């Protein structure tokens, strides 16, 4: 069978049988160039025409094996020595299609197919040629399998990458056969057996839009990363991403990874049908070579594919649009049209350089199926390939290599050497640049290591300094604490030294006081004797003095005093007489534990008589009932007059008469007051007292009961000015006055003997005499009252007494009164402008004379008490042992100095003195 190319000579007339079959020749075109058929050469890679034209498109057929489920015989046969495909129709006719080569997958695998038809094109790319390998055919014909292969058989893409980067072996024959001059010249034409540096881009054309599959396919990219949409500018995709490198394995893995991102869908025609065109662009910048691998989507019928839905129909329509645009471009070029519609599709726009560039070659692989059901698709594909094979390009006549002169050969070789030298220079330059970068990186790394070493040394230094600073800080704190403790120790030593000096001074003072004690006792005894004698001398003038005092008091009413006197029937013989006991009833002295407590007489109030209670415990033991005698005694007031010349008798009588007129019948009113019932000491008697009056100028004698009179008088010591325990009762006259009580202050622990508390009613005159002479023997009268109340007590103290002595007497009085809760109090200095009370610590340093004067009387003072509310105890630092001892020593010495020791006095001794 003749080749499908037209012949210049007319052929024989057709026979009737030939007229019934499919035409064997491609229809001629009016623009088609007619040239004689030429015999292909061995080792050719698409032979050139004998004249001045060449075929830029080489068409190879790839027939897949028959599907396992398909029935019937194959509809395709290989004819013409493996360069033609015969298609048998259903009616028994056949049609032959002449191609540049045919390969059957049952007889030849992908590796054999690649070595036989593709490797020669790849070797041309390695030396700077440009080649486009596109796979065309209906869906399910094996296009993607031929281009990408499978795990066991790599496709054209991966084999081409390996050959370009790693350098393939010698050439396998061209389309016309193997062997010949081309064998053994492949490596010589390449110049080296070394790998090259390439750049690879992977594009996808889906629904007439170009997408970059390499975008979002990095190691850190997610699987559902969006694809980047690109635009065509200058026959190329703008801003496309490239994979650069010279390692075939690495680039192959990247391409395999992004190839899986293509849009694939299952149809009735193909279980895994590609719904987009895939284009892999591989550039070799060092030699200017370029390889484009195009896996086209298969054209299909919408109804036959079973596509439903708008999106599926749109996909099929866009696929068919691209394939149809490529057919029109091929027909236009083959027909020699002046206008080629490259811009009808994005696919044809990217393939424009492949059709127009004189140095570019196109290898079109037609994939077909031998299934009789796909016969119409197979015929359409073969017609498309036959049409593309008719494309010719007017080019300069190629000079045969065997006819080239030595000069031309040397020129070509020199140009190749220059190119290789330039490439080597670029590689060396790049190597130097990388070496420089490596040196810089090493220097930076070295600097970083030095900085790291410095930082480590600095860190160690800082840690050492920190430890040293911390230790120094600790030492400084220890030194400061030690210094402060030393300073405090020195202060304590100084304080101890001062306290020792004070202690020595106090001990010296104590010795002086002990030496002065006998002298003081002698002085006190002398004063007592003098007063007793004076009281005895004035006993006769007591009655007249009472009247004078009543008149001198003016409008001040007389207070009535009622005292309960218990008489012991067993000791009637031991009652003192009035004359012998008048002085002893006015004073009492007790000594308990070598401590002497002093009491005095008030100047303003003169008690006419005092009655003492007997020892109740002895009475209870004896079982004898006591007889109670009550007597109302009128109390007189004495107004102390300054020492002056006696007044004229006439003037005195006139003044007494005026006073009597002003005072009225207060004495008659006083007689009607009832005597109160017996009460404990300190209780107020609000009821009128029952009183018994005799002669106004006489005092009824009362019975006195004393203790044991047989005691040895030697047991009695010096007697200080005594104080009488009295009870002041209210009356219509005396209720206008503040009650004043003079009491002998007893020790709380050791009560006073009943011998010193007994007296009789006839001693009132002597007491009046003593009251008139108060203040003459160095005694001070102190009247006690609460801050917002009446007078509650009157005391006599030594002139050198202080507030602490007065506090002790008052506390003993409160304790003797039997109060369940002893109320705390403080002293007020009414003359102090601030009104602040005297603190208890300062009472020992405040003398009695600092108290305010009472009614402007000399040696008469008023002590005002303020109740102290109990406050929660506050935490106080305890005294050191030395301070505690010092305070105790100070208090003992002070008490000893103020209260010299005296021996108890016997009543017999007092009788002897009075006699």
Curated annotation (Swiss-Prot):
Residues 1-16 have a biased composition (Pro residues). The keyword Coiled coil applies. Residues 1-28, 34-53, 676-718 are annotated as: Disordered. Residues 426-517 form a coiled coil. The keyword Signal does not apply. Keywords: ATP-binding, Coiled coil, Microtubule, Motor protein, Nucleotide-binding. GO terms for biological process: microtubule-based movement; plus-end directed microtubule sliding. Residues 56-391 form the Kinesin motor domain. GO terms for molecular function: ATP binding; ATP hydrolysis activity; microtubule binding; microtubule motor activity. ATP binds at residues 137-144. One of its GO terms (cellular component) is phragmoplast. Pfam families: Kinesin. PANTHER family: KINESIN-LIKE PROTEIN KIN-10A (PTHR24115:SF416), KINESIN-RELATED (PTHR24115). Belongs to the TRAFAC class myosin-kinesin ATPase superfamily. Kinesin family. KIN-10 subfamily. This is Kinesin-like protein KIN-10A. It comes from Oryza sativa subsp. japonica (Rice).
């Amino acid at each position: 069978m003749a080749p499908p190319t037209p012949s210049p000579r007319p052929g024989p007339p057709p026979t009737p049988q030939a007229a019934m079959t499919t035409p064997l020749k491609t229809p001629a075109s009016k623009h088609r160039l007619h040239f004689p058929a030429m015999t292909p050469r061995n080792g050719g890679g698409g032979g050139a025409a004998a004249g001045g034209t060449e075929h830029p498109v080489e068409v190879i057929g790839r027939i897949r094996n028959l599907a396992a489920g398909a029935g019937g015989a194959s509809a395709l046969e290989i004819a013409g020595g493996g360069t033609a495909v015969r298609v048998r129709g259903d009616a028994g006719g056949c049609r032959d299609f002449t191609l540049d080569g045919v390969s059957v997958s049952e007889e030849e695998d992908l590796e054999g197919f690649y070595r036989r038809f593709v490797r020669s094109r790849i070797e041309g790319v390695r030396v700077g040629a440009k080649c486009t390998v596109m796979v065309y055919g209906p869906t399910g014909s094996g296009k993607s399998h031929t281009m990408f292969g499978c795990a066991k058989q790599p496709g054209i893409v991966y084999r081409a990458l390996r050959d370009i980067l790693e350098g393939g072996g010698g050439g396998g024959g061209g389309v016309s056969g193997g062997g010949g001059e081309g064998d053994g010249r492949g490596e010589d034409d390449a110049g080296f057996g070394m790998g090259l540096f390439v750049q690879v881009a992977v594009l996808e054309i889906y629904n007439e839009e170009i997408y970059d599959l390499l975008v979002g396919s990095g190691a850190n990219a997610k699987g559902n990363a969006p694809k980047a949409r690109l635009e065509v500018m200058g026959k190329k995709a703008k801003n496309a991403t490239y994979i650069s490198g010279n390692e075939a394995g690495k680039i192959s893995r990247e391409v395999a990874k992004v190839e899986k991102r293509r849009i694939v869908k299952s149809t009735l025609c193909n279980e895994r049908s590609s719904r987009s065109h895939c284009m892999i662009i591989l550039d070799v910048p060092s030699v200017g070579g370029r390889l484009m691998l195009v896996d086209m989507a298969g054209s299909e019928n919408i109804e036959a594919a079973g596509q439903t839905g708008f999106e599926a129909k749109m996909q099929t329509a866009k696929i068919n649009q691209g394939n149809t645009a490529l057919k029109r471009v091929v027909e236009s070029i083959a027909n020699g049209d002046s206008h080629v519609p490259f811009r009808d599709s994005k696919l044809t726009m990217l393939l424009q350089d492949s059709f127009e560039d004189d140095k570019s070659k196109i290898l079109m692989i037609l994939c077909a199926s031998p299934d009789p059901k796909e016969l119409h698709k197979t015929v359409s594909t073969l017609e498309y390939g036959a049409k593309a094979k008719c494309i010719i390009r007017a080019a300069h006549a190629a000079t045969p290599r065997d006819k080239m002169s030595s000069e031309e050969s040397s020129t070509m070789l020199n140009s190749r050497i220059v190119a290789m030298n330039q490439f080597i220079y670029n590689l060396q330059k790049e190597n130097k640049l990388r070496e420089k970068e490596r040196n810089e990186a090493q220097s930076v790394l070295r600097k970083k290591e030095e900085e790291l070493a410095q930082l480590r040394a600095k860190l160690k230094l800082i840690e050492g300094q920190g430890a040293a600073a911390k230790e120094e800080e600790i030492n400084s704190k220890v030194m400061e604490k030690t210094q402060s403790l030393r300073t405090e120790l020195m202060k304590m030593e100084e304080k101890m030294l001062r306290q020792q000096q004070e202690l020595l001074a106090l001990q010296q003072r104590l010795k002086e006081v002990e030496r002065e004690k006998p002298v003081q006792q002698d002085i006190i005894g002398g004063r007592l004797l003098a007063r007793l004698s004076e009281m005895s001398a004035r006993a006769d003038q007591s009655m007249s003095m009472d009247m004078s005092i009543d008149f001198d008091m003016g409008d001040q009413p007389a207070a009535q005093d009622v005292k309960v006197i218990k008489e012991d029937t067993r000791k009637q013989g031991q009652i003192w007489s009035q004359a012998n006991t008048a002085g002893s009833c006015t004073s009492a002295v007790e000594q308990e534990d070598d401590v002497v407590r002093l009491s005095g007489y008030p100047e303003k109030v003169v008690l006419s008589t005092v009655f003492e209670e007997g020892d109740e415990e002895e009475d209870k033991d004896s079982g004898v009932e006591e007889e109670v005698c009550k007597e109302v005694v009128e109390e007189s007031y004495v107004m102390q007059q300054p020492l002056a010349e006696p007044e004229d008798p006439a003037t005195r009588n006139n003044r007494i008469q005026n006073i009597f007129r002003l005072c009225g019948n207060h004495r008659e009113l006083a007689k009607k007051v009832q005597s109160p019932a017996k009460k404990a000491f300190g209780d107020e008697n609000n009821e009128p007292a029952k009183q018994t009056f005799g002669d106004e100028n006489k005092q009824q004698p009362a019975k006195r009961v004393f203790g044991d009179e047989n005691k040895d008088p030697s047991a009695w010591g010096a007697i200080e000015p005594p104080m009488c325990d009295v009870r002041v009762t209210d009356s219509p006259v005396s209720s206008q006055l503040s009650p004043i009580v003079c009491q002998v202050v007893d020790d709380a622990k050791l009560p006073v003997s009943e011998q010193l508390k007994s007296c009789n009613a006839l001693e009132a005159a002597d007491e009046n005499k003593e009251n008139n002479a108060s203040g003459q023997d160095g005694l001070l009268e102190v009247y006690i009252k609460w801050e917002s109340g009446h007078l509650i007590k009157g005391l006599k103290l030594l002139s050198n007494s202080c507030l602490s002595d007065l506090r002790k007497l008052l506390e003993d009085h409160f304790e003797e009164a039997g109060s369940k809760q002893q109320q705390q109090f403080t002293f007020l200095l009414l003359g102090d402008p601030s009104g602040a009370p005297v603190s208890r610590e300062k009472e020992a340093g405040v003398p009695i004379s600092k108290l305010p004067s009472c009614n402007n009387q000399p040696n008469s003072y008023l002590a005002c008490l303020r109740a102290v509310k109990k406050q929660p105890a506050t935490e106080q630092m305890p005294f050191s042992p030395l301070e505690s001892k010092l305070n105790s020593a100070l208090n003992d010495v002070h008490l000893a100095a103020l209260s010299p020791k005296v021996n108890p006095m016997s009543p017999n001794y007092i009788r002897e003195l009075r006699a």
